[in-house]
């Protein structure tokens, strides 16, 4: 049985070659993957890898690397279980991940990786589709038939059937299950079968393939997914297709002629934090007269647009929230961030804006007015909020975080000069 190895690291940490089963072949594979993605995932050193703000999971052959988020600069090793749970819950809430009961149990036992959860999600969706009954579609098929139907491919017919007068080489329509949707799902099943060897999911995957129709092997690309038909008949397939897309487009077999099979499911933690806060604020504002918008944009210069992370609209008044996934400690916000908030206030006619950072403890000390060039008394202002992402137990995510942020924004101003 193939032995699977697992490494857990934090974002912005350094993983040295030779450390914790991370070998030169893994380093080379990661460097090639990084080049394919415009060097955005890692910084490469001569002796290892420095991870950036991307979190998630990588698998190179039998080595799985989980990249976990963190707030503090130096996060203890023993907190990795807590931060894995944070990442899973954030992905779940933002609908990038779904955990089934078996997966939930395994997560609690720390016997499962993030990649296993994605694989299990996909297999459960395909199993459900098989149980409901896989759809048939019309599709074109080219080959030899014994009765003339469809379009005769004359040149190939002469070439192949000169000695077989009873055959016809045609392109014709077939009504069956070997269509593009099932071919895409079949490719994802093959990838999971390959990468799950030695894990508890491998047997489940092999069993599922026995119930899945035999379909033509394809190598799906980004354009393949744009060709998939959409209809009410196909609606039950949407989740399975979206997971298949994530798996297929992030799978790199024999990357740049190497021998390692690799899959990378990585998420920008800045964007994930933004989406997470947006959802929590929407949840908190359901019973209030507050409209919440994400990535509302306005033209800034020529074709350049600006878009704050979150815009709140209440009684025709707008408020701005911009999220930053970084711990600034006791430091002031950067000049760049303050300029950004000033421009947002000006363009959205907002009286106040909030820079929002994650923290271990809540800290909000009101708003400070921007200095007015024309001595305007009611100049707009900006606040700095550090919000605890955990409940008091410091292990579970605070599901009331949205209410806390709304309270900072909507209550009477506490203004400092």
Language model feature labels by segment:
Residues 1-257, 263:
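Residue(s) in the substrate-gating loop at a strand-loop-helix junction
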Residues 1-31, 257-417:
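Catalytic core segments in nucleotide and nucleic-acid processing enzymes
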